[in-house]
Regions:
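Conserved glycosyltransferase catalytic-site signature
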Residues: 61-62, 284
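Gly/Ala-rich phosphate-binding loop of Rossmann-like dinucleotide-binding domains
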Residues: 65, 69, 295
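Short arginine-rich
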Residues: 311-321
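Active-site cofactor/substrate anionic-group-binding motifs, chiefly glycine-
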Residues: 43, 49-53
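Short, small-residue alpha-helix embedded
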Residues: 218-222, 276-300, 304-310
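Ribokinase/PfkB-type carbohydrate-kinase core domain
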Residues: 1-38, 52-60, 74-76, 81-266, ...
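Short, conserved phosphate/pyrophosphate- and ester-handling motifs at nucleotide-, phospho-/glycolipid
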Residues: 68, 213, 283
Length: 340
């Protein structure tokens, strides 16, 4: 694994599309207590104090791009922002010379992410204003963006579910990048499950990987009348069948582990044991490391292990900082040593 990652030499860049959000993370220690306080304030209003919160850059595409560049990859991020949020984007990536920003003028999204404990697991609920991410189509991509697509080593389109024109955008981006690997991460498709099933049939022949989490996978399994995820054996069976039905390789990440299948073969790799401190954006870090694994020609089990390691380091960070390749490899080496 080490040699393959060290020998990774990208001629072009990894192109990431297309969403940028300004995120506010609100950490809720006592959900029931907060709900009670809100009800008490509904008649006359007032303040509820002592709720920890902070602002970060967000959006699946922006998070994936940030994680990729931390892993040492050249990245071209195509997104939308206004003059104020453009400064935030530029500041975020200012220390990384391998990043090219293609910022289309428009309204960025805004998300308030509520993080709380649910039976020992940290979960998040995101309240979003989509901004101009909602209607980001091929017409947004000018000659400069099309040139970078043509030279790309890989292209990933994220947050399909929030973009009404995502299928159209994906088709255009993949057609303009014939020699690149193509990835799609749909995000939460709960409000558009049937439409996404149709999109997969349209885009499938150009897709190298569909990247989904447990919730998204269960929704998609339901569209094909397949069993939802349960234990490891069931997960492997369901993901393999889903890959067969869609004719697309599936890369799934869950809290217990990650799974890949191309419809013929299947692999499952358990997650690293970790106490989560930060969950918003963890799937984006997993996507980034998984993509790097593809480009480095890692075997499926190696690739899943590498992606799991990257995600575990991220969620174990209070600030949610994506790891470097060396940090991920060090974790994997340490874990293997401890199991001997």
């Amino acid at each position: 694994m080490l040699e393959k990652l060290k020998n990774l030499n990208l001629v072009g860049s990894i192109v990431v599309l297309n969403d940028f959000f300004l995120d506010r993370i609100i950490k809720i220690q006592d959900l029931a207590g907060l709900y009670k306080q809100i009800l008490e304030k509904t008649s006359l209003g007032g303040s509820i104090r002592g709720i920890p919160q902070f602002d970060i850059k967000g959006g699946n595409a922006t998070n994936v791009a940030h994680a990729l560049v931390k892993l040492g990859c050249p990245v071209s991020l195509i997104t939308v922002a206004d003059s104020t949020s453009s400064h935030i984007l530029k500041e975020t990536f200012s220390e990384f010379p391998k990043v090219s920003l293609f910022i289309i003028d428009g309204k960025p999204g805004r998300t308030t992410s509520l993080e709380f404990n649910n039976n020992g697991d940290i979960v998040n609920i995101m309240l979003s204003d989509l901004g101009d991410n909602e209607n980001f189509g091929p017409d947004k991509l000018g000659s400069k963006e099309q040139v970078v697509l043509k030279k790309a080593d890989a292209v990933i389109v994220t947050n399909w579910a929030s973009n009404e024109r995502a299928t159209e955008l994906s088709r255009f981006a993949f057609e303009k990048s014939k020699s690149a690997l193509h990835f799609l991460d749909p995000a939460d498709i709960q409000t558009r499950p049937g439409e996404f099933k149709e999109a997969l049939s349209e885009l499938g022949s150009d897709l190298d990987s569909l990247c989904i989490n447990e919730n998204e996978c269960n929704i998609l399994l339901g569209q094909y009348g397949l069993d939802t995820l349960a234990d490891v054996d069931n997960t492997k069976k369901s993901v393999k069948e889903l890959a067969t039905r869609t004719s697309v390789s599936i890369d799934l990440h869950t809290s217990i582990g990650s799974c890949w299948s191309n419809g013929n073969d299947v692999e499952f790799v358990k997650s690293f044991p970790v106490q989560p401190k930060f969950v918003t954006g963890a799937g984006d870090v997993w996507d980034a490391a998984n993509l790097v694994g593809y480009l480095a020609n890692l075997e499926p089990a190696e690739r899943l292990l590498f992606a799991n390691g990257a995600a575990s380091l991220y969620i174990n960070s209070f600030q949610g900082i994506p790891p470097t390749i060396d940090q991920v490899l060090s974790l994997i080496k340490s874990a293997k040593t401890n199991t001997l």
